[in-house]
Amino acid sequence: MRGGIEGLYPLETTRFALSLPLLRSGPLPLTRRGWRRFPEGITPQFRSLGKFGEKNTKGTVPIVWFLLTLQAFKQFAEMTKSYEEINEKIRKGKAVVLTAEEVSEMARTMKPKEILEKVDVVTTATFGAMCSSGAFLNFGHANPPIRMERIEINGVPVSGGLAAVDTFVGATDCNPQNPTYGGAHIIQELIDGKELTLEAWGKGTDCYPRKHIKTMISLKTINEAILMNPRNAYQNYNVAVNSTDRTLYTYMGTLLPRMKNASYSSAGELSPLLNDPECRTIGLGTRIFLCGTQGYVVWNGTQFNCSKPLNEYGVPMGNARTLALMGEMREMSSEFLRGAYFEKYGVTMYVGVGVPIPLLDEDLAHRVSIRNSQIDTFIEDYGQKGDLIGKVNYEQLRSGEIEFMGKKIHTAPLSSLYKARKIAAILKDWIEKGQFELTAPVRPMPTGTSLQGLKDLNL
C-alpha cells in the first residue's frame, strides 16, 4: 500500500478509502443501509461492486470507479475549521489573514470554497460617531470621605447615581454653558494623559461626612477607567437627506435643504456586522480591537434589531444589529477615540472598532466576500418625520454622488474609511504576529428581536 492501490491512486486517497467503516478487506457488496450512508451524487453503479480488482461484468464496476467514487465522496464532504485550529496556526505564525476589502477583491475570481481553503481570518473595522458610549471611573476615597451625589469634571456634569466615588461619564454629557465640550472630550483627554478638574458635592452622612471636594485627576491617580459603550458598530444605517427648505442640524451632520447633500455612516464592506450579518462568530466574549487596544464584546448592543428587511444578498438594510463593547482606557490611544461636536446637535465620540471573523466554513467565506455594490441601505428624509423614500448601495455612495428623484446629490461619509482601513490593517498585523488570538462567543446574540417605541401620554 505504500504507493496507493496498484499504484493508481495516492496513498492519501487509499487511506481514506480503507478508513470507511462500511468497507472490508474482502468482498464489497453494499447493503441498503450502507448505500444510504453515501450522499446524493454518488454513482449508482456503486451498488453492484464486487470484489477488489473484479472485472466489470454482470453489472459490477471496476476498481477505478470505486476509487473515483471515494474521491468524489471526499470532495463532497464540507470543509470546516475550528477556533482551536485557527489559533494554533496563529501561534505558529502560519495563519493567513486578510482584511475584508482584500477578501472582497479575492472573491471576484474565487469561489467561497477556494477562499475558505486559502484564508483563516478576515479583519473588519469601523471608525464612526457613536453617541451611546462612555466610561466608568472610580476616583478613590478622600480623608474624610465623601459620598459624591453631584459631580463635575472640567465643568461637565456627570453621573452621581452610582456608589460613593464612582461615576459614569457619558460621551454626550456637556455643560449647557459650553455645549461644544463634553464627556467624549473628557474621555479623550484622560487617555491623552491630561489632568482634569474634579469637583463633587454630597449631603454628608455619618459614614461620609465630607460635603464638598475639589481636586485634580488623571488616569495615574484614579483606580479604574473602563470604556463601556452600550451601543456601537451599527450593522447598517440609513442615508440622511433633507427635502425641506431649511437647513437641518442632526446627528447625521448638517443636512442642506432640497436634498443638496446626503450623509451616510458605515464602512461598507469593511464593517464588522456586514461581514457576519447573523453574528455567527460575534457574541459575548468576542475579543476585538477597541480604540488601539484589545477589548471585548460584552453583550448585544442596545436597539439590537433583527427584524430589518434583507436585500437579495442577505444584507440587513437600515439600522439593524449593534454591539456593546468594553475595554481598558489606560491601554487606549486617542488616535482611535476622538471627542467631536456636531453643529447645533451636540457632543459625540468617534470610536475605532475592529472585529476578526474566523472563516469556519463556506457560509462565512461567502459572507465576508460581500462588496459595496451588494450592500444596500435606505434613504431617509429627515425633513419628513423620517420617511424612507428610496434605497442606494455603498458603491454609489462612495462615488461622491447619487442620482435620486431626478437630482444629482452630493454624498459624504460621517465615518472615516481611512481610519477603518488602518484599524483592519493593525488587527491583521497583530494576528499575523501571534499577538491576538480569537475567542469563541460564550453566549450567542439574540435572534428575532425588534424595537419598541415610546407612547406619548399627552396624545
Residue locations for each model-derived region?
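Short hydrophobic transmembrane-like helices used for membrane targeting/insertion
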Residues: 1, 5, 42, 61-64
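Glycine-biased, low-complexity coil/linker segments
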Residues: 1-3, 32-34, 48-52
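Anaerobic metallocofactor- and corrinoid-dependent redox/one-carbon enzyme cores
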Residues: 76-89, 94-459
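Polybasic, lysine-rich low-complexity intrinsically disordered segments
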Residues: 13, 51, 55-58
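Short hydrophobic targeting helices and cationic amphipathic motifs
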Residues: 10, 39, 47-49, 67
